Amino acid sequence: MLDDVAFIKTPAAKKQPPASNECGVWTTDSPAIHNAPLPADGPGSTSFSNTILFSILALVPGYITYKLGLGFKTWVFFFLILAIPILMAYWSIMSTFSPRINEKVKYPNRPISYYLEFHTPELKAKYETSNGGKGSKIPIETFQELYFDGKVSFKGDCLDVLEYKHDWASFRFTLGLFRFFLLGMIPEVIFHSQSQDEEQVRDHYDRGDDFYTWFLGPRMIYTSGVISDITREETLEELQDNKLTVMADKIDLKKGDHVLDIGCGWGTWTTFASSKYGANVTGITLGRNQTKWGNTLLKEYGIPSDQSRIVCCDYRDAPKSSKPSGKYDKITSVEMAEHVGIRRLTAYLEQCRDALEDDGLLFLQYSGLRKNWQYEDLEWGLFMNKYIFPGADASTPLSFFASCMESVGFEIVSVDNIGVHYSATLWRWYRNWIGNKDKVVNKYGVKWYRIWEFFLGSSVVASRNGTATCYQFICRKNINSYRRIDYVPQQKGLQGPVQEGTKWAKEFTNFYD
């Protein structure tokens, strides 16, 4: 199949500046990532008080009820009427006036016209020439919508300008943001159904294989790769091959293992595990194009269908293995759990548990969010839900997800944070996308090109700076009969330093029998 598809060679990166502390903190200069020139922190949860918010929610209806001389039912009535306006007002005020978490990073304080070009007189007057000609910061949600509609442009490279967004954008909550959250996201969270999953996944992944070849490259893997060397710029293919190798090692993959790959995408891991390790892999995806691509790829690698296959089905309808027990030795779920919806997350993990042999292992790669949030984190998450991954509302802080894992009977063996690895992967996707601009625009239009340019560029920043991150979990059933000692050799994070040598103390000889 790859012989019939042309991929761009990832365009060369521009030369990056050396590390310095000109902005107030020391920046990095690794060729593996796009290094942050302005890693500023904005306002966030440290100045947000739930106590004050809940007090206002209770006291405002209470005060009105008291003045009217009425009772509890009246309080409930006014609470229901006023709750949403109070919430909107409080979040708007706090996101507008809260102080930054810290001010170690100093803003350049350049005029907004240094970064952006507005294309209508009204927008120029509002943002570019106001405030004595210096302009005013634009709410990031407002900017997104204007940019997608072609009413404002970056002066320079999208990613380079987004690196300085704290200097030209605010993270104030807007009416449009509230509208989407209340009328778009909340109903999806509540009603997250199987038919909804099918509609959203197929709309996203069956858009056209060419759409994804234009940024994913030959491996066609839509998940984070892994950096192995921070002193050089590894190719996108190297990052993904690193990840595949890490996955196989972490689950101690062996010939003949029966593996279920939930959300298998275009079948690259399925093909890798089948061809290199001789595993029997069943990959499942809702994408029809992905199913066709994956099965063709397996055939090209000489994998018979009675060994491995890609099945187009919902995870709730995953087929049983060919083992007498019908269960799997290993299960892999790579950035799939986020899409099941927070309401069904526990049920999804229970299904993984029930499909796994008692001595099996679960590899789960999961995109998460930081608990100590900043307003830019919340706005980025809402953008992602609106434009990129509708229904993917189960990205959560680590503590919540780990609690769900443990509550269904899994024991977490290890967890690795690979957020900066994701940033490296996204940086290469971004450059591929920019390099294929003409192809994208000719087929899908300027708006789709801009949406995904912004998505990829902002995600490079978000996953490097901590707005979003990614975790690799290895889990096993938390039962007494599990032979835990067998997995010790695979715990490379523990074994590596030990094998390098541990001798340090003076020899002790004063023993007694």
Curated annotation (Swiss-Prot):
EC number(s) per entry: 2.1.1.317
Highest taxon listed in the record's lineage: Eukaryota
Catalysed reactions, as listed in the record: a (4E,8E)-4-sphinga-4,8-dienine ceramide + S-adenosyl-L-methionine = a 9-methyl-(4E,8E)-sphinga-4,8-dienine ceramide + S-adenosyl-L-homocysteine + H(+)
Keyword Calcium (UniProt): no
Keywords tagged on the record: Lipid biosynthesis, Lipid metabolism, Membrane, Methyltransferase, S-adenosyl-L-methionine, Sphingolipid metabolism, Transferase, Transmembrane, Transmembrane helix
GO molecular function: methyltransferase activity
InterPro entries per record: SAM-dependent_MTases_sf, Sphingo_C9-MT
Protein location: Membrane
Record-annotated membrane-spanning stretches: 52-72, 74-94
GO BP, one annotated term: glucosylceramide biosynthetic process
Membrane-topology descriptor: Multi-pass membrane protein
Broad class of the protein's primary localization: membrane
Identification of the protein by name: Sphingolipid C9-methyltransferase
Source organism of the structure: Candida albicans (strain SC5314 / ATCC MYA-2876)
